Amino acid sequence: METRVAVISIIVQNKESVPDLNSILSEFGDCIIGRMGIPYHKKSVSIISIALDAEQSTIDKLNEKIERLSGVQAKTAYGNI
């Protein structure tokens, strides 16, 4: 099946959700191209960008799992590639 390039932008407000988030990201590690995390101390949040190359259904599943975490928001942007 065809894969798509996408970026999931994540904002973590609840630091207690970080271990679960890392576990989810490890589960999808084979489709992750790269990851960048930035702690924003002024607002007490972490901002994470995940670059992916995967089937649409896999990207959607990852985004849904992330959004189920307490204090974590995620949005996905798709490339036309």
Model-derived regions, located:
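Long, contiguous binding/interaction regions
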Residues: M1-I81
